[in-house]
């Protein structure tokens, strides 16, 4: 199974989820300065323009190689890149893992909730996905709130599941199924 970029791009009047552009480099640079984003994603911790552009190209490649889809979370009015939402295929057929981040200047406005709701509903209703899941550290209360506010169901606690810089961490599992959509 592969995913193609939604056409037209997904929007709810607050955010637009679109393909990464080379002009989004400032967003990648700001994300690289946040210690938590590079720790849990592929955003380069040591930012250079070349590394930032290579990261954007790798995001394009996710769709091309069937790995999943990486979308920019952008302001609907200005088109300014504010973060990312990613859905990646997992071993179980029809299952994707969702991940997301916002640069610090974009936090506190529920933009992640808008993005997660848009892409999860698109995946379940239009892209043939059967299950969207997320793994969140117990300490990441903000991310748990994003998932819960968008209808994800908390399923359980996995001990020593996540790996960050060779350190293991617990994870809370969330999922959203087509039957959860209202």
Which role does the model predict for each range below?
Residues 1-35, 70, 74-182:
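Acyl-donor (CoA/ACP) binding surface of acyl/acetyltransferases
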Residues 32, 41, 63-64:
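Hydrophobic residues in alpha-helical segments
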Residues 36-58, 69-71:
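Conserved GNAT-fold acetyl-CoA-binding loop/helix
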Residues 51-54, 66, 101, 169:
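A generic membrane alpha-helix/interface feature
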Residues 58-62, 122:
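A generic secondary-structure signal
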Residues 61-66, 152:
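Short loop/turn motifs at secondary-structure junctions and domain boundaries
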């Amino acid at each position: 199974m592969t995913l193609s970029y939604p056409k037209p791009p997904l929007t709810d009047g607050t955010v637009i989820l679109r393909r990464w552009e080379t002009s989004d480099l400032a967003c990648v640079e700001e994300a690289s300065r946040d210690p938590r984003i590079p720790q849990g994603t592929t955003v380069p911790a040591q930012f250079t323009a070349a590394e930032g552009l290579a990261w954007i190209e790798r995001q394009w490649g996710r769709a091309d190689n069937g790995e999943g889809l990486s979308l920019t979370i952008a302001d609907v009015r200005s088109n300014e890149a504010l973060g990312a939402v990613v859905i990646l295929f997992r071993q179980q057929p029809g299952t994707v893992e969702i991940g997301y981040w916002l640069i610090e200047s974009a936090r506190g406005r529920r933009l992640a909730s808008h993005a997660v709701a848009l892409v999860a509903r698109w995946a379940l209703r239009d892209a043939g996905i059967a299950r969207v899941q997320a793994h969140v550290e117990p300490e990441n209360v903000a991310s748990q709130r994003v998932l819960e506010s968008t209808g994800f169901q908390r399923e359980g606690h996995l001990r020593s599941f996540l790996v960050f810089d060779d350190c293991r961490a617990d994870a809370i599992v969330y999922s959203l199924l087509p039957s959860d959509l209202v």
